Amino acid sequence: MFKQYFKQALQMLKENRLTSVISILGTALSISMILVVVLQFQINLVGFRPESNRDRMLYILGIRADSRDDKNRNSTNMSDGVVKECLYPLQTPEAVTAIARNNAIVSLPDRQLFKEYVIKYTDPGFWKVFDFRFISGKPFTDADFSSGLPRVVIANTLARELFGSEDPIGKDVLIGYVPHTVTGVVEDPTRAAYSAYADVWAPYTSNANYVNGMSCGGVCGSFQGIILARSTSDFESIRTEIKQAVSRYNAAGREFVLGMNFVFSRLDLALGSNDMNGGIRKGWKEYLTKTAPLLLFLLLVPTLNLTGVVQSSVQKRRSEMGLRKAFGATKGRLLVQVLCENLIITLIGGLIGIVLSVVMLQLGKSFLLTKETAVTFEMLFKPVLFAAALFFTLLLNLLSAGLPAIRIAREQIVDALNNK
């Protein structure tokens, strides 16, 4: 039965080429615009190198530091002291890292350059949380970190700019005119991996500006924390352990009280949660309230046009449908036939829509993501994309062909045969 419907659909495509092209292009455009929204969400949510384990990550993007007399309130990043007392001692996670971002001029001892690069000051745990692919060398070690030695890992593009085809391992680079020895070279991370992205990574203990911070009585600083759980089931245990660590920290009677109220999962961040204005956690309700009207608009506008096209096509076959009903075809079978035949068109449009959505994302990434973000195959082609494409294709098929199919199925045999 379905094989016959498929043959009939192909025959209709050949007979009504203009109508078929309009239907396919309308479907492709609708699906592509919807998938751009899906892709943007997917890039913010799913894992890809060097953030392959996003589903197991927790993020501390900010803290509160309030004076005990309530005269001073700060929403900021944490100091290295908070990191050492509240994050490093955690027992439940697999790994913990603290990260401070900066921009600085990177040059060579014998060649002065003036271009700024992104530098992440971090710790050895960084290389456990993120899965960078090393082209040569290795990360800076625990001993380097403990001793505050000026060691760096650099991205491959920067390595080529500075050293050409030479091996940079063991050579010095100047960061803010201070010599640092290169210990490793990694593949360039995409800017979409914002937490991991940089051109240079160095131990924060090698920079005195990040050690022994005294702002807000030693609470405020430059660091954000990222925690890699062994399993998502450990999230609540980790949050509880953090609360206990914060309570112990505040029990010391410091001038400022530390607040670490929000420990976000990757899903929280993808849904729009942030630490601005004291911290806001958003769920699916808030996300869909913002996104659903756009998706509905993108779905319904082409649906109305496609419904007219399908209706016109069905009208030409009223006599055929009436004849089938006269020979015993049920309303359900006629309904399934129209839906199946139209599904061929929507599936073709859906496949084109997937390709078109990737092209649209690439062309429009300057305002959808950031202009410098490299959109990679690993980021885009996930099961989420194909599941979303299939869902919206089937939904579009049901909406555009459903009404004409129901109408033709309900029509009286005599009216259909007489084409009234």
Give the label of every model feature segment.
Residues 3-4, 11, 15, 248-294, ...:
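Membrane-helix entry/capping segments
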Residues 5, 25, 384-420:
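C-terminal membrane-exit region of the final transmembrane helix in multipass inner-membrane proteins
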Residues 18-29, 304, 319-365, 388-396, ...:
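Transmembrane alpha-helical interface segments in multi-pass membrane proteins
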Residues 37-107, 113, 220-224:
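Membrane-proximal extracellular/periplasmic loop immediately following the first transmembrane helix
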Residues 99-100, 108-141, 145-146:
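The feature marks short, hydrophobic/small-residue-biased sequence motifs that occur predominantly
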Residues 125-139, 150-280:
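Mid-to-C-terminal secondary-structure elements
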Residues 289-309, 356:
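Internal alpha-helical transmembrane segments of multipass membrane proteins
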